[in-house]
Structure formats: structure tokens, C-alpha cells
Amino acid sequence: MGRIYLALAGAVLFLSCQSASGQICKPVAERTGEVGCWIIASQPVGQLANAETFWHLDVYATRAEAEAARAPGSVVVESLGKTWLLTIADQGWRLSGGERIAEIGPLPIIAGQTYSAQYMEAIFTPGMVAPTHTHAGPEAWYTLAGETCLETPQGKQIGRAGGPPVIVPGGPPMHLTATGTEQRRALVLILHDSSKHATTPEHDWVPKGLCKI
């Protein structure tokens, strides 16, 4: 609980693994099983005045309570056994009611740019990977279980449940691998330029394999 700073990396819109090569992230309405990457909400955030912002995660007992507490920049989702109110807002922002789970950031953005938030539920078994891709804005995840290794041109970073998440700004290519021995379960945010796709495949950069398991 409480604040979590410096938390950005790997939403998995181009998943593959040995048993399911080339699987992409799909709308949750098309879900056919638990494992995979599922788009659970897309929310226009609007023009953001500052060069950084934060992702606030609160849990409510019921969807009705969460809906009643919604603010501009908020969306209610039911994911991973909980009812979440997810909000893009300044550092220290709070609503009444609910349980504050995390404040993730700062997320580096372009002041004055118009953004949209795409939220996903990611459930990976160890060994699943996300082929190389980029994002049109910062990406963040909140990990409830498991471990993930993210490789970028700057090296590798490890995100674990209970540890500090990883931040990657928009732009650089990345390659993600679910590592460890436990199923990875996470909520994922891509805060992207509203005029661009959230995720784009990257073919010019080849990872070094720093996250091999």
C-alpha cells in the first residue's frame, strides 16, 4: 500500500510463447481463457499541463461504490478478483472512500499533450514473452504476483510483486519476458498520445537476450 514511485514497463500487446506464438492483446470481450493480455478499458484523459503525472490505484468493495467515487481521469474496472478505480492525476491526489493500493510515478509525459489511458490485465506463465515493441507514451504496471524481466537498449530491469515497479518512458524499444517460477498477474497502463496507437511493433532493434530464463 501507499506510494510506489518509478514504476514503468512492459504491457504485453504482442505476446508470444512456445505454445502460443504471436498471440496479441485482445479486448476483454474476446477473452477465451485466463492466460494472456486483455484490454479491460480505454479512457481519454485529456490535455495534461505538467511534464509528469501519476497513476493512482484504489480498490472498492463494490462497483457501485467505485462508480460513485469516479472523478475526471478515472475509470472503474473489475480485474484479478477486485473492483478498481484507476485514475491519472497529480501526485498526492486522493478520493474519499476505498482503499489506496498504490500511487505509481512519476510518469514522464509532454506538457500540453493530449493523452489517453489504455488499461490491461496481464496474466503470463513463466517463459511467455512480448516481442519487441514501442509505446507512444509511458507504460506502467502494478504486479500482484510473479516476476517479469524487461530488456531495453539501456539494459534489463526486473519487476516483482511486492517490489518497486519499473519505469520506461515512451519511445524506446522493449522486450519483455515472464521470469521466475510463479504466474505473473498484473494491471498494466499505457498512457499514450491520443493521436497515436498505444503500441507499435519494433523491427529495427534486436534485444541481446538479457532476460533469457
Residue ranges and their predicted role:
Residues 52, 79-83, 149, 169-197:
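Ligand-binding loop in jelly-roll beta-barrel domains
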Residues 5-16:
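Bacterial N-terminal signal peptides
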Residues 114-119, 184:
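Extracytoplasmic
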Residues 112-116, 125-142:
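A short beta-loop-beta micro-motif enriched in histidine and acidic residues
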Residues 20-114, 202-213:
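A short, N-terminal "cap"/entry segment at the start of jelly-roll beta-barrel domains
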Residues 30-31, 136-154:
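Glycine- and acidic-residue-biased ligand/ion/polar-headgroup-sensing regions
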Residues 28-29, 59-64, 124, 152-173:
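Short acidic-glycine-tyrosine-enriched beta hairpin
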Residues 1-3:
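N-terminal secretory signal peptides that target proteins for export/translocation
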